[in-house]
Design a protein with these regions (language model features):
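Acidic, glycine-rich A-domain
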Residues: 1-198
Length: 198
């Protein structure tokens, strides 16, 4: 026994699955000011934490509408971007347009949100309103838009993606909006004030 040094020391090693985190931020006009800046601050904190952890891939996207079209852009992808991209470019992000919500989710799922076997997958959403978008061809609002969002959320879950969706409130928020948000995201819906996000 005295010749075995393992008697005196033990090392506990824990292994964690690789993880993929997608952060999607609503950059519609109503998010301007504190809501957007706090959402960005929160996202940056998660990106930095993931970078230190070393085994978490992070993608951050922003969504809004422009020229009568839904827009979603990937502003950071840890697989190929350095953290300096955030400090150099994110300061130019501004809010505008309306909330296309799951119209953008559908596009994201095709390229960014497919589940990866053996890895943990998470989707975090920041938003402050109900889905709304219209042009000459489509009117995306109310119950049909909510049902479409429900469908996309269910599809993500079926792909093994865990969801947390945050409704950002500031002052008075219509009860109907909160009800719609809960209808779309169910138990994954959370309500937060931007002053308490960090």
């Amino acid at each position: 026994g005295f010749d075995n040094m393992n008697v005196f020391s033990q090392v506990t090693s824990e292994r964690y699955n690789k993880a993929n985190l997608h952060i999607s931020i609503d950059a519609s006009g109503s998010m301007s000011g504190g809501k957007l800046s706090k959402s960005i601050t929160s996202a940056v904190a998660m990106v930095k934490a993931a970078d230190m952890a070393g085994n978490i891939n992070v993608v951050v996207s922003f969504r809004w509408t422009s020229d009568k079209k839904p827009v979603v852009i990937i502003c950071y992808n840890s697989r190929k971007d350095k953290l300096t991209k955030i400090t150099k470019l994110w300061k130019y992000i501004n809010a505008g347009g309306t909330t296309p919500e799951s119209l953008c989710y559908e596009a994201l799922m095709k390229k960014w949100l497919s589940g990866v076997r053996g890895e943990d997958n998470y989707f975090i959403n920041y938003s402050d309103g109900e889905p709304w978008f219209s042009n000459d061809d489509i009117y995306y609002h109310g119950n049909p838009a909510q049902k479409h969002t429900q469908k996309m959320v269910k599809m993500m879950k079926n792909n093994g993606i865990k969801i947390s969706s945050y409704f950002i409130t500031e002052g008075y928020t219509y009860r109907d909006s909160k009800g719609s948000f809960t209808k779309m995201y169910g138990r994954d819906a959370n309500f937060i004030d931007p002053t308490n996000m960090m």
